[in-house]
Each structure stands twice: as structure tokens, then as C-alpha cells.
């Protein structure tokens, strides 16, 4: 009798995706982050669901409802901090996942890559709206500053901002709609992740050397299910250490002060995972220019497949490109640091140099390095 997992319509899909999936035999731990992102999404949806049972999306009670969750709900503090720090783990995994794709040339799977860029935008939008919900000082002012950027769009800008706010300032209508969007978006992310996997399984996975691996495939289960399980354990360990030992390490102290439209915090800044983009936004002394640079800082990823002109897919045998890649990583870390600093000398100029370098590496230096490496191959 044929195994049910190979015949049953539903089980067959699961089988072909997670059990009998032919997988390259040499993929390293850098390929674990896809499944870790899946785990993060499940954690966020579950903790978020339980938080939504106790949260109220009204400006007068939002802050106290979060306090109530932490003080009065059974294990509410655990659920709240799992959700807040789970977002940080989500972004760490996201950045490493994208970084791996850039290093090993996974962006040549154009459909998979573009869905991935769309996923990145959606997750960033979800995280931004979630940050507004506790209705602390940084929630309110972060929402005000970031939504106000829409006013830089010529002609329709002001109307667009007021339409987003549901009034003439960030208020009750804004909070309610942000809660609604924050609830629905993770399910859209889950649907997009399925499409992401669908396109990936059309081509099969890439591997560290970037060569065709059809001659050497192994079944996903048990080899990579075990490997993923180890990743799950490590992720949960790090998350629990963060939640149980220093839950506020990555948060902002200002968010423990209820939102006050009459009192602006001295330094308005987003969560740490947006600081690199925030630094790029601030490095241009023009509102519209800054907004364009902000969007392009992420959208530039969609251009990467078209800028690839190397004869090799992976960077593993391309030392010049490797140097530029790690320069890009260092540059992003610099931008993250600058995004959290006040707007004064020398941070302004450092941010501007780092922003120029970020775009230069991706748009100019990497394609030039690839051309040089192609020439060196002929020698």
C-alpha cells in the first residue's frame, strides 16, 4: 500500500514541502534562518492573539491596558515581553536571512527574492504599527514623525497624512486603525511566506558554492528537520534569556511614560531594527529627498539581481566582493549606531558618509568588483 503522505491531497503538499523535499547536501547553518523566521512568525501570532484578548485600542485606556496585562493577567508579563523581544529576534533572523541571500547569490531566484523584499516591507510595516499600540511617549511621537513623512509627497501629501491619521493629528482613530492593521498583517505575511516557499520549491534551494546541486540531493527529513530543530532550540534559548533577564534591554525608557501630545521627547527614535533606515532618512537635509532615500534603502534590494554581472553566483570564491560585502555589513552597523544618536556634529557627517557608502557599494562598487573578478578569471 502506498504511504498516505504521498497520496492524500493535503498530506502530499506537506510531504513535498517538508519531508521528501530534495535538498542540497551541503547547505550550512545560514540556511536555517528561513525556518527560524517561520518559528518567529508563529510565536508572534500566538503571543499577539493572547495580548489582543486583554488590550484596548482606545487612547484613554491603551497604556493602562498594557500595564494591566503585565500586572494582573496570568503570565501577562511573559506574553508581553515574548511579543516585544520576539519582534527583535524576528528582525535579527530577517537581516541574517537577507544577508545570506546577498552573500551566496540567492537573489538570482528573482520571484522568490522579490516576494522576500515584499515580505520585508510588510514585516517592517507590521512592526511599526505594533510599536504605536502601547501608547507610550515614543509610540505616539514615533507614529507622528513617521506618518508625517507622507506629507513630503507633492500635491497629495497633506491629504494623505490626514487620511492616514483619520483626523488632524495622531489620535483615537489612528490607534484603532493601527491595531486593526497590526492584527491582520501577520496573516498576510504568513500567506506571502507560503508564496515565497512555493517559488523557492519551483527551483530548489541554492547552496554555499552556488553550483547546480541536482546530482547530490538528500531528503529534507530527517537531515534538515533535525538541523532546524537545533536552530529552534537555540532561538528559543536566546529569546527566553532576553525576556527573563533583561526584557527592556532593546526597548526605549520613554515608552514607560504615557503618550502626551504637549510634551515632545528630546530624542525621537524608532526601535533598533529601523535605526539604519532612520539614519539614511536623517542624512538628507530635505524632507522629500529623505523619504525617497528611506524607501530606496530597502527597495534597492529588488535591484540587486539586475546588478549581478559576475560569472559566479556565490561570493565564496570572490575575495574582492567579499571585502565589499563585509564593508557593507560594517556600514549598516554604523548607520544603526548613528540612527540612535542626536542630530549634531560629528554624527551628522558620519551618517551622511555612511549613507553615501551604502548606496555606492550596492550600485557601483559591487558590479565593478564583479567585472574585475571576471577579468581575473581569464588570466
From Swiss-Prot:
Q: How many cofactor units bind, and how?
A: Binds 2 heme b groups non-covalently.
Reply yes or no: does the keyword Nucleus apply: no
Family, per the entry?
Belongs to the cytochrome b family.
Q: Where is the signal peptide?
A: none
Which GO terms of the cellular component aspect does the record hold? mitochondrial inner membrane; respiratory chain complex III
A molecular function (GO) held by this record is: metal ion binding
Task: Output one GO BP term.
Answer: mitochondrial electron transport, ubiquinol to cytochrome c
Checking Pfam families in the record gives: Cytochrom_B_C, Cytochrome_B
Question: Where is it chiefly localized?
Answer: mitochondrion
The protein's name: Cytochrome b
Going by the entry's taxonomy, the superkingdom of the source organism is recorded as Eukaryota
Electron transport is among the record's keywords: yes
Cofactor(s) of this protein: heme b
Amino acid at each position: 500500500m502506498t504511504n498516505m503522505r504521498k497520496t492524500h491531497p493535503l498530506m502530499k503538499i506537506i510531504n513535498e514541502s517538508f519531508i521528501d523535499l530534495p535538498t542540497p547536501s551541503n547547505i550550512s547553518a545560514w540556511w536555517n534562518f528561513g525556518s527560524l523566521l517561520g518559528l518567529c512568525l508563529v510565536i508572534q501570532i500566538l503571543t499577539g492573539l493572547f495580548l489582543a484578548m486583554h488590550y484596548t485600542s482606545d487612547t484613554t485606556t491603551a497604556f493602562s491596558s498594557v500595564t494591566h496585562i503585565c500586572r494582573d493577567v496570568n503570565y501577562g508579563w511573559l506574553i508581553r515581553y515574548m511579543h516585544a523581544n520576539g519582534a527583535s529576534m524576528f528582525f535579527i533572523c530577517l537581516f541574517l536571512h537577507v544577508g545570506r541571500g546577498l552573500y551566496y547569490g540567492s537573489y538570482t531566484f528573482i520571484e522568490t527574492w522579490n516576494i522576500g523584499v515584499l515580505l520585508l516591507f510588510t514585516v517592517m510595516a507590521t512592526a511599526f504599527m505594533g510599536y504605536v499600540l502601547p501608547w507610550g511617549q515614543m509610540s505616539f511621537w514615533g507614529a507622528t514623525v513617521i506618518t508625517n513623512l507622507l506629507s513630503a509627497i507633492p500635491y497629495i501629501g497633506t491629504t494623505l497624512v490626514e487620511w492616514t491619521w483619520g483626523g488632524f493629528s495622531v489620535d483615537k482613530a489612528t490607534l484603532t486603525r493601527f491595531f486593526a492593521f497590526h492584527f491582520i498583517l501577520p496573516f498576510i505575511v504568513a500567506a506571502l511566506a507560503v508564496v515565497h516557499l512555493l517559488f523557492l520549491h519551483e527551483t530548489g534551494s541554492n547552496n554555499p558554492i552556488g553550483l547546480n546541486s541536482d546530482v547530490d540531493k538528500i531528503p529534507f527529513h530527517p537531515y534538515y528537520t533535525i538541523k532546524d530543530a537545533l536552530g529552534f532550540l537555540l532561538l528559543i534559548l536566546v529569546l527566553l534569556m532576553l525576556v527573563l533577564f533583561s526584557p527592556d534591554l532593546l526597548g526605549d525608557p520613554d515608552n514607560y511614560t504615557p503618550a502626551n501630545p504637549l510634551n515632545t521627547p528630546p530624542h525621537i527614535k524608532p526601535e533598533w531594527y529601523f535605526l539604519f533606515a532612520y539614519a539614511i532618512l536623517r542624512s538628507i537635509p530635505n524632507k522629500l529627498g529623505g523619504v525617497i532615500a528611506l524607501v530606496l534603502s530597502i527597495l534597492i534590494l529588488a535591484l540587486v539581481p539586475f546588478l549581478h554581472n559576475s560569472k559566479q553566483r556565490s561570493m565564496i570564491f570572490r575575495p574582492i566582493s567579499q571585502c565589499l560585502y563585509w564593508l557593507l555589513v560594517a556600514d549598516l552597523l554604523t548607520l544603526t549606531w548613528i540612527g540612535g544618536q542626536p542630530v549634531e556634529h560629528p554624527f551628522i557627517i558620519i551618517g551622511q558618509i555612511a549613507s553615501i557608502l551604502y548606496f555606492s557599494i550596492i550600485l557601483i562598487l559591487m558590479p565593478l568588483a564583479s567585472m574585475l573578478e571576471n577579468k581575473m578569471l581569464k588570466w
